[in-house]
Amino acid sequence: MIDLMPKKNTFLLKKKYKEDSNNSVINNLFDFFGKEFCFHQITLTGFPIIWIDKTLLIEVGKFLYHLSQPYIMLYDLHGVDERIRLHREDLPKADFSVFYHLISIERNSDIMIKVPLLENDLILPTFTGLFPNANWYERETWDMFGIIFNNHPNLTRIIMPSTWKGHPLRKNYSARATEYEPFFLNEQKEDLEMEGLKFKPELWGMKRKNDNVEFMFLNLGPNHPSAHGAFRIVLQLDGENIVDCVPDIGYHHRGAEKMAERQSWHSYIPYTDRIEYLGGCVNELPYVLAVEKLANISVPEKAEVIRVMMSELFRINSHLLYISTFIQDVGCMTPVFFAFTDRQKIYDLIEAITGARMHPAWFRIGGVANDLPQGWNILLKEFLDWMPKRLKYYINTALKNSILIHRSKGIAEYNKKEALQWGVTGAGLRATGLNFDVRKWRPYSGYQNYTFEVPVGSGISDCYSRVMIKVEEIYQSLFILKQCLCNMPSGPFKSEDSLTTPPSKECVLQNIETMITHFLQVSWGPVIPENESFQMIEATKGINSYYLISDGGTMSYRTRIRTPSFPHLQQIPSVIRGSLISDLIVYLGSIDFVMSDVDR
């Protein structure tokens, strides 16, 4: 039997180093800029949040970027409408705020910089001079809140159509369609929308021709099979060579962050499944963990192991689809049909446990929905016996094929520095040789108790290394699943906290208050204490996270969902310029994205 006890003090040492690093950077900021210009907000996020005046923004960014152990990655950037927030005690006066979430790999720590803004002065300097991936994040922040970023290279809508009116994440923008005029689409309006989709190269700094050649502009998507969803890339071509390109996203947008403001903390769980629709329970995990931090709910050990088991099953399921469709994009059809056979076995196991297949909505605040059914271990063991042999088949018949290797090795390359500049996470980052897996470096749900390795590349991330990293990750997930099978604890599958679990019959018979509390929490939803929390996880396609702000109500005041696919698509032009169209198809297949994850 595999030992599930934590390895000797490794997790505690990392945690202590992280706390010391946080204290150090706070003191450095206060010493350099002065305490009167920096306000330290205490939250449940697990990292320091520092409010600064907007005049200091670029200087603070440069200061953090050039530390001896620098904050090298802009992980996230977005906004908050602060106007109707009730619990803002001691926070700087603000109608809106913009937050900048930075990560230091060397410190294994984060910091969030917040800038308060008044409604009559919603202007900030662009961060693109320091972090190129700020481009799309600033466009989305303007799109959703109307906050202007001076000197931005192209501050246009990115999620909503160019013809859209208003900024949807403002609090005075209704979340319900019934509060608007009925939608209609006549011929005139259709022409207007089609005109808005017309690509104008000059708006993107592109020339239609140079001295020797007239460029062709080609729409790849939004209905192209190799675009992997409703995704459009406009290519500037010189023959078959890509001179430049512009990714166009937003076709799959469903307003997931806005929906969170009108759903109870509990009833929002089904929406999390659909953020990245192949990840299933993996998507539920960062949300419920973040809510549990806010509510100070401890999860039983059995529930933690079940969560890990389900997450790894969905990870394998997603990776199998990715590997097989990548092989298909390169030109081999057979493996994709074998992969669907293997994925069917996983879905049968998931359905036996949860009652659903792709979108179980099965994790709960405080645990999981049900205990494991009888026979779950037999199904899991059968799958664990089956899968390693099948993986060898994929490797020997397709991934060692000389044509596939020739078509993918050395294609769409980038190094560690470039990956960090663009906010790349997951297999794409680890293929550059950087060993950064959240399950190891920032363990959650008990991952520190499992033995597994983190596959890394040799220094350059290309199409072939990215797919081979995912193959190795399947082997590691199988090893984690074996540990779950051999060491499943007994005990409850859900916390007994009254915020999430109905009272026992004994309590009901003795205390009428328990019934009143239960009635209110079922009808209105649990009331979560005011605070802020954050949780990142190693999802199937990279790092996924939820940043939650509670105002002490039954619904979230602000839910920010940071997905890995969004920055991965933003990186495309910097990687593919100078390559062939055929190389772009292979590159898209190697990224591992779905558009629901990008557009939310």
Curated annotation (Swiss-Prot):
Gene3D superfamilies: Cytochrome-c3 Hydrogenase, chain B (1.10.645.10), NADH:ubiquinone oxidoreductase, 30kDa subunit (3.30.460.80). Its EC number is 7.1.1.-. It is found in: Cell inner membrane. One of its GO terms (cellular component) is NADH dehydrogenase complex. Residues 1-190 are annotated as: NADH dehydrogenase I subunit C. It catalyses: a quinone + NADH + 5 H(+)(in) = a quinol + NAD(+) + 4 H(+)(out). The keyword Translocase applies. GO terms for molecular function: NAD binding; NADH dehydrogenase (ubiquinone) activity; NADH:ubiquinone reductase (non-electrogenic) activity; quinone binding. Residues 214-600 are annotated as: NADH dehydrogenase I subunit D. The keyword RNA-binding does not apply. Keywords: Cell inner membrane, Cell membrane, Membrane, Multifunctional enzyme, NAD, Quinone, Translocase, Transport, Ubiquinone. It comes from the Bacteria. It is a peripheral membrane protein. Pfam families: Complex1_30kDa (PF00329), Complex1_49kDa (PF00346). NDH-1 shuttles electrons from NADH, via FMN and iron-sulfur (Fe-S) centers, to quinones in the respiratory chain. The immediate electron acceptor for the enzyme in this species is believed to be ubiquinone. Couples the redox reaction to proton translocation (for every two electrons transferred, four hydrogen ions are translocated across the cytoplasmic membrane), and thus conserves the redox energy in a proton gradient. NDH-1 is composed of 13 different subunits. Subunits NuoB, CD, E, F, and G constitute the peripheral sector of the complex. In the N-terminal section; belongs to the complex I 30 kDa subunit family. This is NADH-quinone oxidoreductase subunit C/D. It comes from Buchnera aphidicola subsp. Acyrthosiphon pisum (strain APS) (Acyrthosiphon pisum symbiotic bacterium).
